Amino acid sequence: MNATKKPGALAAWAVAVLMSALIATGVSAETAGDWPQFHLDAAHRGASDSGAPRSNETAWISQDIGAQEGSSVAIADGKVLVNCVENLVCLDQLSGEVLWNASFEARPDICQVWGASPAYSDGKVFLSALKTICLNASDGKLLWSYAHPTGKGAVDGGPAVEDGRVLTSDWDGHHYYCLDEETGNELWRFTVQGNAQSTPAISGSRVVLSGWEWGLGGRVYCLYLDNGTEIWNLSTENSPCGSAALSKDTAYLTTYNFEGDGDVLSVSLQNGSLLWKESIARTDCTPALVPGRIHVCGGTDGYSDKATYCLDA
């Protein structure tokens, strides 16, 4: 598969943090609010209750660590956790100094522009790659690893952690897996039509995930977290390339259209009915949710204008 290189050379090699407001006031980053997994939490709300820095003054820039394009950092317990293609690097949140560096087996046959984001929970760090791994957050030592039965590795979709469970994927193996957080034992697996590309979104007893196909329509699924039983599925005209964001009773997601505009979809979490659809530039963005509003980005270099949208939920 070919992928267009995403802009921003800095993101490919180093991590920069704007924290001047925290440092100047003496407030620790931990009390200001963590960001422990993709899009903040297992529901992918994507909006922090913390205040943003009041200026763009750079607090620190890490050394060249080979940071993965297309991956987000996780921030928890005073640490910044970074996917670096074949290494997971842990930085000190206040100084940017490397605390530890743990190697892992990256998927060799996929363009490295796409990378899964790590997740943190209860002193442990999780990452989906050729295998799904769990590390001790204190020193980076391996606690367990889970080899996907298909032999395939994750692409784009990282782990989601909730209620003692880790949800992970194997992309063109077409499966999502639910693992025990402490042992890595498989609890259940689910097969999707298309590639298992999303980071699963979890709200209460329900999980929303999707199947993506190049240039074709896709499908969104809702499962019970406890046992992986399907509750409903919804076919989409264009494929969902990103991940869903969940509110109390609604799932929001976007679609990517290679021939034109994509969409933002609002779907009932209860029964999978389409509540509304709004056309935007093609995107693999996961929506960010604040009360009453949805924020999404769209557009691709050379194909469509790039824009940020704010929609009424």
Where are these regions (language model features)?
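Secretory targeting signatures
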Residues: M1-A32, T308
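Intrinsic disorder/low-complexity segments enriched in polar/small residues
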Residues: K6-P7, T31, C84, L94, ...
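Detector for intrinsically disordered, low-structure N-terminal pre-sequences
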Residues: A14-A16, G26, E97, T191, ...
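Blade/loop signatures of beta-propeller domains
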Residues: E30-A59
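Repeat-blade elements of multi-bladed beta-propeller folds
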Residues: G33-A42, G66-L88, A106-I133, Y146-Y177, ...
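A short beta-strand motif characteristic of beta-propeller blades
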Residues: T58-Q63, E97-P108, K141-H148, N185-F190, ...
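Short loop/turn segments that connect beta-strands within beta-propeller blades
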Residues: D92-G96, N136-G140, D180-G184, Y224-G228, ...
